[in-house]
Amino acid sequence: MTLKQIREILRQAQEHPSIKSIYFEGGEPFLYYPILLKGIQLASELGFETGIVSNGYWATTKEDALEWLRSLAKILDSISVSSDLFHYSEELSRQAQNAQNAARKLGISLDFISIAQPEDDSAEVGIGQLPEGFSGIKYQGRAADKLADCVEGQAWQSFTECPYEDLREPGRVHIDPFGHMHICQGISLGNIFETPINEICTEYNAKTHPITGMLLKGGPAKLVE
């Protein structure tokens, strides 16, 4: 995503009164550090709450972690760092601990995103704000491809609802580098580089949308029917 695109996204977001926060996610946003830093700065200057989701690969030592985050102090409100056995060889990685130490020194709020292993059926899947500790796996994206075989299968007819996002009154959307505005990853409501955010939101009707309408009526199973 280019700076020009980021500026356009922020301009449109500023015109929508319900958008209060901007988060940079991935992939891994720290791989594009100069653009990430400028994007956070621009969002902060416009009055948005700012956040980043990262795997923390950059926090190899306490000293290095401090330098990576130093320029983000005072413009970054929070950072979420993934730490579990999908990302590292230990549940709470050295990188995550280094990032936490640096964030604390710089006054940046930091929390961990930790996903349980497939065989752990005691972990609840997080809806919206993730709970403390480990969350269960959402079988979407790569998880559906790589991990679904690790658990007992269920009949497709049993998937009769989508419990993870509010499709009628979404509290968040995801915008990809191509401008697609996703209500849930993979379900695009439109392209903001072609149609402004305000117009997309005004025209969106969850019941009549060709995908969300079916999901509301009967979940993923309804799409199959």
Please report, for each region that a protein language model flagged, where it lies by residue.
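Conserved glycine-rich "GG(E/T)P / GGGxP" loop and the immediately following alpha-helix
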Residues: 1-128
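Active-site-proximal segments of metal-dependent phosphoesterases and phosphodiesterases across multiple
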Residues: 129-134
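Accessory C-terminal segments flanking Radical SAM cores
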Residues: 135-225
